[in-house]
Amino acid sequence: MAGIASTVAVMGAGAWGTALAKVLADAGGEVTLWARRAEVADQINTTRYNPDYLPGALLPPSIHATADAEEALGGASTVLLGVPAQTMRANLERWAPLLPEGATLVSLAKGIELGTLMRMSQVIISVTGAEPPQVAVISGPNLASEIAECQPAATVVACSDSGRAVALQRALNSGYFRPYTNADVVGTEIGGACKNIIALACGMAVGIGLGENTAAAIITRGLAEIIRLGTALGANGATLAGLAGVGDLVATCTSPRSRNRSFGERLGRGETLQSAGKACHVVEGVTSCESVLALASSYDVEMPLTDAVHRVCHKGLSVDEAITLLLGRRTKPE
């Protein structure tokens, strides 16, 4: 892997972290995959499978799993951070003393931190003291299970340092996974953080039996919300019209493999938040709707779909009531 260390640390053995570890290995890299639970690491090393998070995907022998963060980070000049958005800070506080100086730190998480309203790249910089050019983001229409099956996919590698971006691009470029570079870190992160919320809304609509017209309206108006927020934060609108915006939004809103859409469907069918949560791994949109709405409010950006999802998830509003609320809004030009 020209331009990048032969060993890359992937911190987080969930579905997405494991899938990207496989991509890196398939592209010719040596990968150390950190798992929070020792039994997950042991299972990966002994069976080459991660049935808890990515069942059915045979992992290459060039992936070594460990539950020891010091072992995972030792000597790695590139660190992919695959933990949930709301645990990013706590994990980084533990790992910061172990991070090699000058390492490229790559966020895989899609969310806005509660309380601080920081994007993940901002959290990374805040905790580690890294310079902004050291921090990159990978985001796009990347359903982990499809990538693990080697189905063709594309993604965005966003970094203000073009050299680091190209090095990551080369490291990830396999026969089935095509990365594109982009200097717009803000737009790439906002697209990834917001699309999960819109996918929840799409799932809710499907869950109560609504059709394609409704889904198309949700996706399109959801994109308008994402663009409004992104541009208010300084994002390039073209980024949000690309893989990290429209691409990720369409995949997450339309695929039955999407956790956020599936969770929304359960809510639409009348399940409680707690009941739906038992059937799904981490669903970032449930938390992100709160932090994204607060961020939008601080910039005076209107996000009615996000507000409706927030009310359903956190304020006790029913899905039917949310639809009535949205349809009752004042009419205006598109």
Swiss-Prot record:
Catalytic site positions: 195
Might you name a Gene Ontology BP term for this protein?
A: glycerol-3-phosphate metabolic process
Instruction: Output the PROSITE patterns linked to this UniProt entry.
Output: NAD_G3PDH
Chief location of this protein within or outside the cell = cytoplasm
**Keywords noted in UniProt:** Cytoplasm, Lipid biosynthesis, Lipid metabolism, NAD, NADP, Nucleotide-binding, Oxidoreductase, Phospholipid biosynthesis, Phospholipid metabolism
A Pfam short name = NAD_Gly3P_dh_N
Name the catalysed reactions.
sn-glycerol 3-phosphate + NAD(+) = dihydroxyacetone phosphate + NADH + H(+); sn-glycerol 3-phosphate + NADP(+) = dihydroxyacetone phosphate + NADPH + H(+)
One Gene Ontology cellular component: cytosol
Q: Where in the cell is it found?
A: Cytoplasm
According to the UniProt entry, its GO molecular function terms are: glycerol-3-phosphate dehydrogenase [NAD(P)+] activity; NAD binding
Which residues are listed for sn-glycerol 3-phosphate binding in this entry? 110, 140, 195, 248, 258-260
What's the top EC group for this one?
oxidoreductase
Q: What is its EC number?
A: 1.1.1.94
Claim: Cytoplasm is one of the keywords in the record: yes
HAMAP family documented for this protein:
NAD_Glyc3P_dehydrog
The entry's family comment says:
Belongs to the NAD-dependent glycerol-3-phosphate dehydrogenase family.
Instruction: Supply the name of the protein.
Output: Glycerol-3-phosphate dehydrogenase [NAD(P)+] 2
Q: What is the lineage of its organism?
A: Bacteria, Bacillati, Actinomycetota, Actinomycetes, Mycobacteriales
